[in-house]
Amino acid sequence: MEIIIAPDAAGVAIAAADIVTDLVRAKPNAVLGLATGSSPLGLYAELAARVAGGLDMTAVSGFALDEYVGLLPDDPRSYAHAIRSHVTEPLRLDPGKVHVPPGVGDDLDVACHLYEDAIARAGGIDLQVLGIGRNGHLGFNEPSSPLASRTRVAALAEWTRRDNARFFDQPDAVPVQCVTQGLGTIMEARRALLIATGAAKADSIALAVEGPVSPSCPASVLQLHQNAVVVCDREAAAKLTRVSA
């Protein structure tokens, strides 16, 4: 596992964008795994600036990590809406090549299998962008998630619901279920890029990078990935003991 420590959040965005840019230039039709939430927003903004400056990402495909169950794609609180706003439109991607797990439907279990099939038909994910929750979750794979899990409907931990309540009018409006790519799905990406900023992520980064590989910290599974890179700022790296922040 490679560790890159930047001075601050802006440096994290630049370092992460360099990784994506190098991939896109080497493989213009790359398939990206797209994290949602606040962690990757700096990366997406930096990529948007590079696209405005001439970086061509029009042939890139994308698969989002997760979605809330019960929110329609045009709901401004949905991750489908977030992906359109922060990725598809500013990076000038083809909307037909950007996929988000369905949060509504008659049979979400079948839809999850179809999502896995779509990733396979695209040739797999070249680079999976990831954030990390304060409880160590990846995507919406909460603690106790099986390390070999696939895309599925899952329950949201109360900790995660509290963290995400800031995006909703009231805490009770946060959905209790989600659709998420599984840890096994994430591990099949050819490269994994984990982004973290701020002191609130220091404990989870320390566990993910230096703790035991365990379902109690889902992100720790990345220790087993053959090509994983963690890009974090000094605050998020503050509790690492094997590298200098």
Predicted regions, residues:
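Glycine-rich beta-strand-to-loop/alpha-helix junction loops that act as flexible
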Residues: 34-39, 130-134, 197
